[in-house]
Amino acid sequence: MFDIGFSELILIFVVGLVVLGPQRLPVAIRTVMGWVRTIRSLATNVQHELAQELKLQELQESIKKAEAMNLTTLSPELTQTVEDLKQSAQKMQNDLNNANQIGKLTDEQVADIQQNIANAQPSEITEANELDESKLTAYYPPDDDLVSPSTTKLEQDKQNVN
């Protein structure tokens, strides 16, 4: 990198030992090595970023060339891929539109129910709630703890003895 040979490194080490002394030389070497590592990592990052920018620029140029050719002279595989992507995008757009329509229908149904509740008489609301409760009890049977048994266990034991 700097084209420094072994003899030049030893000369720098001896000068550093004379100038800094044996106590401060290791600290100075660690500090300099930290700087060297930082500079190397920065240089590596710059190289990677430049390489990415060059790749991106080449990709943009190839896209511009493809657009200039009007996609007519592309290979059949690329044409098929473009068509597949267009179909996928259209399908996603249709699914999104369907989801929006379902959301609108649900909002309309909620508004209708709220309007019916607002327009209903109190007796109709009570009657509707009672019907809902009867549907719930028909669908969900009551818990065993809440239902009193017809005969207790003691009575069953007495009947079994007789």
UniProtKB/Swiss-Prot annotation:
InterPro entries: TatB. Residues 136-162 are annotated as: Disordered. It is found in: Cell inner membrane. The chain crosses the membrane at residues 1-21. Gene3D superfamilies: 1.20.5.3310. It comes from the Bacteria. Keywords: Cell inner membrane, Cell membrane, Membrane, Protein transport, Translocation, Transmembrane, Transmembrane helix, Transport. It is a single-pass membrane protein. GO terms for molecular function: protein transmembrane transporter activity. One of its GO terms (biological process) is protein transport by the Tat complex. The keyword Amino-acid biosynthesis does not apply. GO terms for cellular component: TAT protein transport complex. Its main location: membrane. Part of the twin-arginine translocation (Tat) system that transports large folded proteins containing a characteristic twin-arginine motif in their signal peptide across membranes. Together with TatC, TatB is part of a receptor directly interacting with Tat signal peptides. TatB may form an oligomeric binding site that transiently accommodates folded Tat precursor proteins before their translocation. Belongs to the TatB family. The Tat system comprises two distinct complexes: a TatABC complex, containing multiple copies of TatA, TatB and TatC subunits, and a separate TatA complex, containing only TatA subunits. Substrates initially bind to the TatABC complex, which probably triggers association of the separate TatA complex to form the active translocon. HAMAP family: TatB. This is Sec-independent protein translocase protein TatB. It comes from Haemophilus ducreyi (strain 35000HP / ATCC 700724). The lineage of its organism: Bacteria, Pseudomonadati, Pseudomonadota, Gammaproteobacteria, Pasteurellales.
